[in-house]
Amino acid sequence: MVNYGFLSTYPPTQCGLATFCAALLHHLSNPMAGSRCGVVQVVDGAYQTMRQDEAASVITARPLTASRAAEVLNRYDVLIIQHEYGIYGGLDGEDVLAVLDRVDVPVIAVLHTVLASPTPHQRLVLQRVIDASDAVVVLSQTAAAALKAGYLIDEGRVSVIPHGAPILGHRRPGRASGLHRPTILTWGLIGPGKGIEWAIAALSHLRDLHPAARYLVAGQTHPKVLADQGEAYRDGLRRQARTEGVSDLVEFDPTYRAVGSLMNMVRQADVVLLPYDSTQQVTSGVLIEAVAAQRPVVATGFPHARELLGGGAGLVVPHQDPQAMAHAIRRVLTEPGLAEAMKERCAKLAPALTWPSVANDYRALAKSLLAAPVTVAP
């Protein structure tokens, strides 16, 4: 069996990469079969090891230098590194290169961000990460195209493996009897750039729906936003809702939810709304989870949304356009057969998006690297 080392943020850190790493680790780990996993955790740009119990919950942490981090990771058969510029130290996260330069096991680099227009230094850092890796994983076809167009890499080293999602039961949770009030849901860590202000503005165009729609914004404020700005963004959204006259339609739920509770909430939604401001986002875990949960999606036209929803799993609208957003939501809630057609399309996509399926793809990739002939320098 293969033993996997990870270089990544990791819970209790609250960020998408930490959640991703924990889920992938869980589904790759198989102690009964002799396959173990370990993490060198990235915290505020520094490295530390973690001692874990069988459930992978953190007990203690020990700081590491780059050379010691590499030494720890070299104890595993394969290293899986999560890459995003903001999690590593140095300019554009360049400190990660000092670790990669010292690693002598096969490296799989998972690129969560492939910018369409990087700065010269961002391009240099990512190119060096690519050069230090034996395989590169991107999470969408759009990201693969951007990577091949903007960087020097053999196409055979690039794999597209989607972000994973939990497996859900086939039955949707029951509803209370009576007139159903539709729920529009946005969830995830909250902060500027999520576009929630445009969603609130869209509600004023949906006042005539009966029964009135409820817009549920679920999730805690992003820790970095909270540290820098406090709850200014969330407070501003509340003020906007009052000004727009839709405060009775908007509900904020800052509760931290475990995976089961979160997915139960998602399955109760009539529409998942992703009003993001970004025009370059090539992967979205929330989008993957919504599709895997077979929920109709309305999203702004960021690249991953255009790719995943283009076949009918959702509707894509222009950025920062409340009227277009409202029109799409109205269609999902009122147009006969549309929501069901979206769910059917999501159901066809869902099996390949589950974490067990995704983990199998990583497992196959790791085994192919270990089976490859070793080139010995003359």
Question: How should these model regions be labeled?
Answer:
Residues 120, 148-149, 164-180:
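Acidic anion/phosphate-binding donor-loop and adjacent secondary structure
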Residues 142, 164, 221:
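Carbohydrate-associated surface elements
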Residues 176-194, 200-203, 216-218:
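Conserved donor-binding/catalytic core segment of Leloir-type glycosyltransferases
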Residues 229-256:
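Nucleotide-activated donor-binding/catalytic signature segment of Leloir-type glycosyltransferases, i.e.
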Residues 272, 292, 296-299:
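Short hydrophobic beta-strand element within catalytic cores of glycosyltransferases
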Residues 311, 315-322, 331-337:
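Conserved acidic donor-binding segment of nucleotide-sugar-dependent glycosyltransferases
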Residues 331, 338-352, 364:
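A short, well-ordered alpha-helix in the C-terminal region of glycosyltransferases
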Residues 355-378:
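C-terminal alpha-helical cap of glycosyltransferases
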